[in-house]
Swiss-Prot record:
GO MF annotation: an example: 2 iron, 2 sulfur cluster binding
Sequence similarity: Belongs to the HesB/IscA family.
Pfam families according to UniProt: Fe-S_biosyn (PF01521)
Binding locations of iron-sulfur cluster: C49, C113, C115
Free-text comment on the cofactor: Binds 1 iron-sulfur cluster per subunit.
Gene (UniProt): erpA
Assembly: Homodimer.
The keyword Glycoprotein is annotated on this UniProt entry: no
GO BP: any one term: iron-sulfur cluster assembly
Keyword Iron recorded: yes
Cofactor: iron-sulfur cluster
Keyword field: Iron, Iron-sulfur, Metal-binding
Function: Required for insertion of 4Fe-4S clusters.
Record protein name field: Putative iron-sulfur cluster insertion protein ErpA
Length: 121
């Protein structure tokens, strides 16, 4: 199955990859919360050692300027400001010896910090 999510607004493949692994983990977390209305919000904000950092939270509300994508029944929300920094990125979920975490591979990042949670563009 393709890792490309569908953009709800256009029905076209989204320019942000939301992997099967990430969608499955989000579905598991939503089930644990017991609220099927939850959506994963991914955002970029100022901070971190490289200037910007990624954030993840659950949200029930879709804002007017949000881009909404769906993958395997899971919805992903990205606000307009964050979207410009995330176009072309891959949102994945990895489990390895170092632990389990959501990972963003972002081609727009000119530098990243050692922890991988902040970047500059």
């Amino acid at each position: 199955m393709s890792a490309v999510a569908e953009n709800i607004q256009t029905g076209m493949p989204a320019p942000i990859l939301f992997t099967d692994s990430a969608a499955a983990k989000v579905a598991q977390l939503i089930a644990e919360e017991g609220n099927p209305e939850l959506k994963l919000r991914v955002f970029v904000q100022g901070g971190g050692c490289s200037g910007f950092q990624y954030g993840f939270t659950f949200d029930e509300i879709t804002n007017e300027d949000d881009t909404t994508m769906t993958k395997n029944g899971v919805s992903l929300l990205i606000d307009a400001m964050s979207y410009q920094y995330l176009v072309g990125a891959e949102i994945d979920y990895k489990e390895d010896l170092q632990g389990a975490q959501f990972v963003i591979k972002n081609p727009n990042a000119t530098t990243t910090c050692g922890c991988g949670s902040s970047f500059s563009a």
